[in-house]
Amino acid sequence: MITLQAMMSALSLPESVRQLLNPVMNQPFGQFVVDSRQVGQGDVFVLLKSQNVTDSIDLEKVAGYLAQVADKAAFVLSEIDVSALQSQFMLPIIYLPSIRDFLGSLIQTSLQQQHPTKLPAVIAVTGTNGKTTVSQLVAQLISQSGIKTAVMGTAGNGVLGEKGQPNLIPSTHTTLEVFNLHHAIDDFAKQGVQALAIEASSHGLHQQRLQGVPVNVAIFTNLSRDHLDYHTDMDDYAQAKARLFDKAHFPTLTHAIINLDDEFSELMIEAANASHLTVWTYSLTNDQADFFAKTILPSLQGGDLTIALSKAVTPQGKLTVNSPLLGRFNVANLLASIA
């Protein structure tokens, strides 16, 4: 069991939020849970709004969720104003409309307080295409240097074996929901994982599923028309991606790797520069990029690639790569991964 009071020194919460939490600050609890069906005795139930923009709040359904946890939860943290239902339940319910801004940090801190571990360095990849390939390549490259590495994304989640091949468990989402994501990272840390390559979807970024994840390096591959059933337009879609390069959202960020050939690269570079990140660019066409595909010699077996490196990266000047991957899009994926 742990208390919010014991966690406060490790959290950067606004004073207004701390004041709202005061009534339950010293209440012992087990863990934060976002699914009412999974709440155990003494857990904290976190009641969140549906992220489907067409869904309205159904208080009758909300009352059902609260009834499920009424005799088990230590208290409830709610993104929904349930004051109209409060008298029906004999448990503290704290209304926190901004809870997604710090929910990941709450979950991570509670896990660390109860079972301290060294969290892995995180490389997060965002973009319409290439996320899976780049995250897999990054994980394999890091693993080849002798660092225990894991990967998370569309293809599944798992730790890479001795030969660099991941043992993947199927994933329900490209980017897991915040509760499952932090528990997965905690499990990797307990296994001694030192580096984690993770896909950061626009849905995951917009819904703050990655909040509290210690991202060190952010990679942008590209942006094309997709997910416009969720995002209002391309600008909204791009802004969701740009969150990954903002230290206000990811304070542990140090580096940004950005595809200079994409029309939205300027937006990502602006976000990274505003956060004073080290920015490295890559390109198939622009020789001013930090990682430039100077020569590409394709073959049926893949191809040879000569990469010109900027002095900002290394005085070495160039790097030659032989790859079995086919297609120019995979040259871009290789550039991102090597960067």
Residue ranges: model-predicted function:
Residues M1-T109, E263, T295-L297, N322, ...:
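N-terminal leader/targeting and accessory segments in enzymes
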Residues G30-F32, H203-H206, F291-F292:
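Glycine-rich, charged/polar anion/phosphate-binding loops
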Residues D35, L48-S50, E79-I80, L96-I99, ...:
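Fold-independent oxyanion-binding glycine-rich loops
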Residues V44-L47, L77, A197, I257, ...:
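Short, conserved beta-strand segments within well-ordered enzyme catalytic domains
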Residues L59-A63, V178, H182, D290:
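Structural motif corresponding to alpha-helix initiation and N-cap regions
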Residues V82-S87, V217-A339:
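Acidic, Mg2+-coordinating active-site environments of NTP-dependent enzymes
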Residues S87-S98, Q165-T172, H276-W280, F292:
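Active-site regions of enzymes building and remodeling cell-envelope glycoconjugates
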Residues F102-L260, F264-L277:
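Phosphate-binding loop of NTP-binding sites
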